[in-house]
């Protein structure tokens, strides 16, 4: 499991796609991983990063919703979908900064 990968995972709201944020050296060794949820609901917020099915190899056009960051146990991860390109991962990190104000 690596930062920038998209996975289907069991979440409290049901199975959904998530983006892994936990840094690489740690993600394979700890029991819980920091993730952010993907959704098809777009609100045009600074806390959203748009992904398209064609460019980002996701099942459908969606946004990464950085207002929905949480941890999931490693056992919750069901199936790897894809991995963001380095450029898109950089944009994700910028969106995280913008959404948290850090």
UniProtKB/Swiss-Prot annotation:
InterPro entries: PemK-like, Plasmid_toxin/cell-grow_inhib
Entry's EC annotation: 3.1.-.-
Catalytic EC class: hydrolase
Domain of life of the source: Bacteria
One Pfam family hit: PemK_toxin
One GO BP: mRNA catabolic process
SUPFAM superfamilies, A to Z: Cell growth inhibitor/plasmid maintenance toxic component (SSF50118)
GO molecular function: DNA binding; RNA endonuclease activity
The entry's keywords: Endonuclease, Hydrolase, Nuclease, Toxin-antitoxin system
Family designation: Belongs to the PemK/MazF family.
Subunit description: Forms a complex with cognate antitoxin MazE2.
Protein's job: Toxic component of a type II toxin-antitoxin (TA) system. Acts as an endoribonuclease. Neutralized by coexpression with cognate antitoxin MazE2.
Protein name: Probable endoribonuclease MazF2
Top-level taxonomy: Bacteria, Bacillati, Actinomycetota, Actinomycetes, Mycobacteriales
């Amino acid at each position: 499991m690596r930062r920038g990968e998209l996975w289907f995972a069991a979440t409290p709201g049901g199975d959904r796609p998530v983006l892994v944020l936990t840094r690489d050296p740690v993600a394979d060794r700890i029991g819980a991983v920091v993730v952010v949820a993907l959704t098809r609901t777009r609100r045009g917020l600074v806390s959203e990063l748009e992904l398209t099915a064609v460019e980002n190899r996701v099942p459908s056009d969606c946004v990464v919703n950085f207002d929905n960051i949480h941890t999931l146990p490693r056992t919750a991860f069901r199936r790897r979908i894809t991995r963001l390109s380095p450029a898109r991962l950089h944009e994700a990190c910028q969106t995280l900064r913008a959404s948290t104000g850090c």
